[in-house]
UniProtKB/Swiss-Prot annotation:
It comes from Rattus norvegicus (Rat). It is found in: Cell projection, Cilium, Flagellum; Cytoplasm, Cytoskeleton; Cytoplasm, Cytoskeleton, Microtubule organizing center, Centrosome. Residues 195-233 are annotated as: C-X-P repeat region. One of its GO terms (molecular function) is protein domain specific binding. The keyword RNA-binding does not apply. GO terms for cellular component: centrosome; cytoplasm; manchette; outer dense fiber; sperm flagellum. The keyword Glycoprotein does not apply. One of its GO terms (biological process) is cell differentiation. It holds the Pfam family HSP20. Interacts (via leucine zipper motif) with TCP11. Interacts with SPAG4. Interacts with KLC3. Interacts with CCDC42. This is Outer dense fiber protein 1. Testis. Specifically located to the round spermatid layer and to the luminally-oriented cytoplasm of elongated spermatids.
Amino acid sequence: MAALSCLLDSVRRDIKKVDRELRQLRCIDEISSRCLCDLYMHPYCCCDLHPYPYCLCYSKRSRSCGLCDLYYPCCLCDYKLYCLRPSLRSLERLRRTTNRILASSCCSSNILGSVNVCGFEPDQVKVRVKDGKVCVSAERENRYDCLGSKKYSYMNICKEFSLPPCVDEKDVTYSYGLGSCVKIESPCYPCTSPCNPCNPCSPCSPCGPCGPCGPCGPCGPCGPCDPCNPCYPCGSRFSCRKMIL
């Protein structure tokens, strides 16, 4: 158990680090491939006009960045993005694996299910319980400027599963936990039949007092000895024989 706790702590720290890196990479991915330092404030820039963290124009420039040729000698608009895309995919795989480990190692017996909502904020997640089913949905709108025009992109997920027969819809609760997982819980562990309450134990009866010992009865008189057989006198070693003539 101690080794498992240490492993989970290290995994949680890795998840926080991964979250920070994913947020940075998504910001890069949502921006246009061209550096718009002259028109707009680029989200990742270090030039004199827009100090850090609003540009990376002093780094190497990608050939597809056209506007940076007019004002700045180099840029990292595309270079950093394409170099880090393999890392982004590996981090996503690590997140999914970690979420499965955390879900399987949870010791709470009242968890009905968990849904991974990575990439969504808690206020963007909705949970609806109706007709014996739980529906977890999340939707996010991405908006960014590109060459004077605004572009929009949408991202949504929807997961649904049925409740066990013994769980009431009013008792279902949910929480947004570690690893961007929404946990659906109920106050009673789901079972096929409702649990019967335990009968109270009956109190122990008091022990009865020990009865007094009865007096010993008088010894009976010894019976009289039987008379000796005349054929076998007492103390004789040989029996008398009757001679027949």
